[in-house]
Amino acid sequence: MYLKTLHLRHFRNYYDQKVEFTAAKTILVGNNAQGKSNLLEAVELLATLRSHRMARDRDLVQEEEPLAQINATLERDTGVSDLSLILRRNGRRTVALNGESLRRQMDFLGVLNAVQFSSLDLELVRGSPEVRRNWLDTLLIQLEPVYAHILQQYNQVLRQRNAYLKKLQDSALTTQDSALAIWDAQLVTTGTKVIRRRDRALARLAPLATAWHTSISGSTEVLQISYTPNVQLMQNQPEQVQQAFLSQLQQRAVPEMYRGTTLVGPHRDEVELTINQTPARQYGSQGQQRTLVLALKLAELQLIEEVVKEPPLLLLDDVLAELDPSRQNQLLDTIQDRFQTLITTTHLSSFDAQWLNSSQILFVEQGKISTSNSIR
């Protein structure tokens, strides 16, 4: 797939900027806080309808403006698609494909696929379980767009069940309350779908990431990735998962009443990353942790390509400076011209002459993009 054009209006610090991509590799050069990352964020939003910066829509809309618009033209093996995403300071998003508004956002997902790799991704190793869940969910949305709807359903039931538990906590009702049993059943049904899909996705991703990690580390380290669902998963069969889920809910009924919140379910899952059987967050240097994240990202690229049958876009946000020369070379050698790649950097010294000669170089300054570094 190839992103031909991108048009940003009132998005972040872009007033009205159109970009035409003329090479498989585009290097965006500029000082910090000029808008390089914002452009990559716009592409990420078109791919996943999510921002890895966890920004709210109103934060994405330029000050004094009611809405922001991201338009793109994408070329795939199946033909050319025009994508449009409107973000409102107050109100719902609107998505359109080839000029036609879509009622369901999940029908927009899967048209553009992209893997984002930024310096923030070290949090995959060092951060909380929520960071790893969000990463896995974002990947799943691209592998199986209906997952966005499944996850939304689960989160909605979870919020409503939590509100009901809070209500029980403040009243004389007991955990035997019949309305709670209804929420339990809905939580189990929707949560089981989340658990099974997360389990399947990691089962496919883990061996790819392990192989990349072995290659990058020179076979000196062994990476293991395991899904540790909050609900005990003996078999990935709907009936068994639902039974285990319901059983654990019943076991935790009293603590849930006491705390007024749901203590069982995929919102408490963990993805465990270990290197040489030691938890990765406790293991070694930042360089080794970067190797792990690089392996995960290369595995994401590979898995998405296997599933959608086309190479996804790769968005590299200021990561080359974070990698040592050998890891830089591993990444750049893997990319070549196979993946359309957008790279942000503050200087061009990280790239050799061959890369520079085969890349489109754009200069970014205060939300304006030019082919020369003297924007007026």
UniProtKB/Swiss-Prot annotation:
Residues reported in the UniProt entry to bind ATP: G30, N31, N32, A33, Q34, G35, K36, S37
InterPro entries according to UniProt: DNA-binding_RecF (IPR001238), DNA-binding_RecF_CS (IPR018078), P-loop_NTPase (IPR027417), RecF/RecN/SMC_N (IPR003395), RecF_2 (IPR042174)
Record protein name field: DNA replication and repair protein RecF
Coiled coil regions in record: none
Keywords, alphabetical: ATP-binding, Cytoplasm, DNA damage, DNA repair, DNA replication, DNA-binding, Nucleotide-binding, SOS response
Gene Ontology CC terms, in alphabetical order: cytoplasm
Family designation: Belongs to the RecF family.
Molecular function per GO: ATP binding; single-stranded DNA binding
Localization (cell): Cytoplasm
Lineage top rank: taxon: Bacteria
Biological role stated in the UniProt entry: The RecF protein is involved in DNA metabolism; it is required for DNA replication and normal SOS inducibility. RecF binds preferentially to single-stranded, linear DNA. It also seems to bind ATP.
Transmembrane segment boundaries: none
